[in-house]
Structure formats: C-alpha cells, structure tokens
Amino acid sequence: MQFVDEATIDVHAGKGGDGCLSFRREKYVEFGGPDGGDGGAGGHVFVQADTNINTLVDYRYDRIFKARNGEPGKGRQMTGKSAEDIILYVPVGTTVVDLDTDEVLADLTDTDKPVMVAQAGRGGLGNIHFKSSVNQAPRKTTKGKPGESRRLRLELKVLADVGLLGMPNAGKSTLIRAISAAKPKVADYPFTTLIPNLGVVKADRYRSFVVADIPGLIEGAAEGAGLGIRFLKHLARTRLLLHVVDLAPMDGSSPANHIDAIADELDRFSPALAEQERWLVFNKIDLLADDEAQAQVDAIVDELGWQGPVFKVSAAAGVGCEDLVYALMNAIEDRRLLEREDPAYAAAQQDLRARLEEEARERVQELKAEARQARQNDDDDDHDVEVVYEP
C-alpha cells in the first residue's frame, strides 16, 4: 500500500431542516391552531484515529465529504429526522489543520473519541413556537441553519519513542532490522529507504519501545534536497534521536563532516528538533580492526567535542546491538517516569514538541510554496521566445 502522510480534504456539515408551517385539522375542530414541528439537525463531521490504518492514501482520491441535511418538520408537532453524522477514520498520529486559519483542530494521538471538525446546522422552528395571545394562527417559521464547511489539511506523523537519522547508506535500515521485527528494504545504494519504517523493539518480555527509520538526509536537505526533508517531521514526537554514522564510508569521506552536516540540517529545518537529545551510533565497526575502530571513534568525538552518549555497533553482524537496545530501553523508561512524576519536566517536553511541530509545519509549507513557484517559473520560461534579427 502506498504511504501517504499528507492530504487536503473539504468537509461540509449538513444543513438543519426547515420548520414546518401547519395547522391542526380535525373534524369538529374549526380552529385547531398551529402544530408545525421543528426541522431536524444536520449531520456533523468527525475525525477519529484508528489503529488499523497507517496511511492517508484514501484521502488522496476522495477529497470531498458531505454530511446529509436534516429533514424538515411536519404537522402534528412532529420534528424532522436528524441526519446521521459521518466519521472520517485516520491513522493514529494525524494532525488536523484548518487551511484557512492555520488553526490546529485536532491532534489524534489516541483512539479514545472522535473530534468534531465541522458542526451541523440546527433545525428551524415550526410555527407552533410563534403562537401568542394576539396571534393565534401564526404563519411564521424559521429556516434551518447552514452547516460548517472547512478545508482541512491532514498531516500524519508516526508515533515512535526513538528516531533514526543519518546520511544515506549509513545502515539505518539494517540497524532497525537487527533490533526489531521490522523488515525494511536493504541494499548497497543510497536512498534504499523511501518511506518511514516503524519497528517494535523488545528488550524483555514486557519491555518494549518503537523506533522509526526515515530516508537518509543529505547536505541541503533543509532547502529541499534529497528525500529526507519531507519525512523529518516524523521525528517530532520521538523522545530521543539515534544518529547513525558510517564509520567506514566507501567514498573515503569524513564521518565527522557527516555528523556536522546532519546537525546543521536539523537546525536549519527546526531549531527545536536540533534541541532533541541525540545519541551517536557508529555503525560498520566490523569493517575495521577493533583498535582502529576505537581510535577512529575517539578521534571523531574529540574533534566534535561531543558530550552525549556514544555506541559502536555492526548492525549487519549484530555486534553491540543488545547493549544499545537496553540502554535505549532504560533511557525511555526514565523519561516516561519523569513525565509522570515531574510536572515541570512534562511541561517542558510538551512545549518542545509543540514548537517542533509548529516549526516543522511552517518549514514544510515554505518548501512546498518554493517548489510551486519554481514550477511556475519553469512553465513561464517554456513559452519565452527570443527573436534575433541579423543583418
């Protein structure tokens, strides 16, 4: 199934039914008085998360969703039938944004209850409501109210505890295969990973966490180069980042330069993302002798002045992966406990995630606008004809 993490849809709630103009008619009752009922309410539009859905692909093809209108009122004080609500099911982790106002209407991180995104119109009043001492036969009714209409952007961000990032071919997909049951495609060429992959990592029988692998980043990603920029937003909800580094690049390039380049791209894409805790994982140590690998890691750490955690692994051979998994599990459990017991820490983390998501949303929209402008400029240039007159 195609992975789609963004879609734009139009939703229209139903209109309320009109109130009824009616008078009671019975044998031997000449002036029965008004008995027009109210109109029924229109249908609301809701959005609800569903764990059985993992892509927004359906909303690429069906973009307009209309709830039914309420039925008009009837005589004998009968209220018109209200329309049924419609519920749009989306993956867990979907954010719903009003395109006209940029208001975030819902952030669906669980499946507890649906969220209303378009409110239906109320039914109109029948003429029975307008009877008075001076007007025993009112002919006045009211129309049903129109329902809300909105243009919405659905944005899917995967929910994971740990996010993997790094240059193409650093071994991220191999690592996620080594530590989880996920089976992403692995090959000896860049950009093998084209979409985010999720894997559940089990440290023990009852201890587990989720890791997300996104396409590799390259220099200039924050300006739209490569594939990874589109998927950086999926790291917004992770608790920490694993920066996977190829310790023995085939092109002889410097791993330290790769680390700096990725850090720069993170900061340019979202300063809040650059603030996320990040661990260095040096991969492919099996391609070097033990003492050579350790010496190279020490030299890189010294050159960068790195103060965070450092791990050495060979994802292909499974070396060092178990130690990494237990270290990650312990760190995640510590953070979960802190969020439950320390309100200040929980508030700070929530603020960081909110800033990260806002910055990521703004940056992605900027890049899309730039891409549209570039395409428009190319189209304009295609029709330019230069005429040169020569003697």
Swiss-Prot record:
Domain of life: Bacteria
Cofactor: Mg(2+)
Compositionally biased region (Basic and acidic residues): 367-377
OBG-type G domain span: 160-333
Classification via SUPFAM superfamilies: Obg GTP-binding protein N-terminal domain, P-loop containing nucleoside triphosphate hydrolases
Entry-linked Pfam families: GTP1_OBG, MMR_HSR1
Location(s) in or outside the cell: Cytoplasm
Gene Ontology biological-process entries: ribosome biogenesis
Residues noted as binding Mg(2+) in the record, renumbered to the chain: S173, T193
Residues covered by the Obg domain: 1-159
EC assignment: 3.6.5.-
GO molecular function ontology, one term from the record: GTP binding
Keyword Hydrolase tagged: yes
GO cellular component: cytoplasm
Ligand binding (GTP): 166-173, 191-195, 213-216, 283-286, 314-316
Alphabetical keyword list: Cytoplasm, GTP-binding, Hydrolase, Magnesium, Metal-binding, Nucleotide-binding
Record note on quaternary structure: Monomer.
Protein's job: An essential GTPase which binds GTP, GDP and possibly (p)ppGpp with moderate affinity, with high nucleotide exchange rates and a fairly low GTP hydrolysis rate. Plays a role in control of the cell cycle, stress response, ribosome biogenesis and in those bacteria that undergo differentiation, in morphogenesis control.
Family designation: Belongs to the TRAFAC class OBG-HflX-like GTPase superfamily. OBG GTPase family.
Protein name per the record: GTPase Obg
